[in-house]
Amino acid sequence: MSRIIKLAPAGILLAASVALTAMLASAADEPTTSELKDRAAIQNLVVKYTIALDTLDANLYASVFAENAEFTFGGNTYKGRDAIRKIVTDLQERRRGQADAPKSYHALTNTYVEFVNDREARHRSYWQTISGPSSGPFNVGGMGRYEDTLVKVGGQWLIQKRQIIQ
């Protein structure tokens, strides 16, 4: 009987250690408040990109990219915020003066964010563009996915590298 009494504290300690390890592992899987805020900020960032493109707001469009960002699509790579802004200003120029200039609406789905660390993340989402003349009809104009590297600069998430894959 004394042997059982001596082993009981060791057994309790072992059980407590296993329980604590399980709790810590479970807690590690739960997102922190900071991570949840970062996910929301990234979601807003990618939506802001589509709003800027659909409304042809060149400054808003450029603002979602880091100063030295790279953006690759259609066989071209644009380097730096000014070159990326020019994508939209060129589009504005092409549409200027058109009586029934085309409109576009981007829809994003299946957004996935993976944090590399607290200042870098990977983002992937699928997109579809509905487009057509202002008077209609609208059709699927394109579809593909975005693959992004995001960086946190001055507390703000920005696109460092974006590749459009169709």
Residue ranges and their predicted role:
Residues 58-127:
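A solvent-exposed, acidic/Ser-Thr-rich amphipathic alpha-helical stretch
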Residues 38, 42, 54, 77, ...:
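Aromatic-acidic/polar surface patches that form glycan- and anion
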Residues 24-55, 59-63:
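Short, low-complexity N-terminal intrinsically disordered segments enriched in polar/charged residues
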